[in-house]
Every structure is written in structure tokens, then in C-alpha cells.
Amino acid sequence: MSFEIGGLRTTNERLLIMNKKKIDYRFKILYAVAILMVVAGHCDGGGISLDFAQWFPYEGIHLALFTFCSGYFFKDAALKRPGRYVCKKLRTLILPMYGYTIAYGLLVRLLHRWGFQIGGKFNLHNILISPLNDGHQFVLNMAGWYIVPLFMVEILNCMIRAFFKRKGWQIPEWIFFAGAVLIGMGGNFLAIMEYRTSWWLTVVRILYFAPF
């Protein structure tokens, strides 16, 4: 039972609210480190050199770090209703992706009218299909390529775990990790063999992020 005295909640209720709003600042720091890595890796294109890859080869792991941070907050409660989890991810990742794709497409179309030659045409293929297998169609939205692989890795992780849970199979966590590492190695192998165009590119990206 809860009650208020002079507008103040009971101590237990205040503690409960504080716990719900508790922030893990370790992951805030990890996100900040990953952002700095991404910025440093792309500064050369603007004439500023912040690249320290000669000291530490970070360019292959900064987005993987984002994937790790996202996966850390996965809750087993999602395994009870995986359909709801999928709908949530569609709402928070895929729908916004298509929203900003349309916005960037309209901006690029406007720039074309002003004489700027940047990005592709504003058509159904570039709006609906290209975000799934490339993500570079309007140039200005190039960073959006990461959304689909992240979405697929999160969905596959949930679906695989939910399948085993419903079967009643207790799979040790190290087996999940070992399998994911093998999948990631398969993605690297496909990339080395130059299977990294069109839909193959999407597959390689998903496989690469699987271990994280």
C-alpha cells in the first residue's frame, strides 16, 4: 500500500521509482567510446586527421561495440512473447529507418533541382529495397545501413532462444556464443571471397555482427 504525506511518497515507493530510472553509466561510456571511434574513422574525408588506427585497429569493431551494447539490454521476458518483441523492433528501428529514408530522398530530389549531383533517384526501389541491401542510395543517409543488420541480429537472437525455450531445451550460454562466433567467421569468409554486393552484402553484415 502506498500513501503520500504532504505530497511526498513513501520511502519504498521513491526507491522503486529510482530503481526503475537507474542508468548504467558504464554503457553510456561505451557508447561514447564507440561514437569517438566512428567520428575518428571518418574525419579524413573532411580533411581532418583523427585516425589512430595505426595504434589500435578499431575500425572493425566500433559498430560491433554498438551491437554489443544493444544486445546487453536484451531481457529474457521477450522470449515469452517473441511476436511482441518483433513488433517493438519494427516500430523502433525499421519504421524510423523508412521515415528518414523518405526525408533524405526528398532532400536529395530538391538538391537535384538546384543542380547538385548527389544521391540516387527518388523512386520506390531506392525507398523500399535499397535500405535493406545497401543503405547508400541517397548518400546523405549512408550511416543508415547499420539499422537492418542490427535489427536482424536482434530478431534472430530472440527467435532462436525462444525456439529452444519452448522446446524445453536448456542450452548453455557458451554454446550460443560459440555458434555465434562460427557464424561471424562465416561472414568474414564470405567477405574475403568478395560476396559483398547486393543481398550478399546484407547477409555478410548480419553474420559479422552475430557474435556481438
Q: Language-model features: where?
A:
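Loop-centered beta-sheet repeat module
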Residues: 176-212
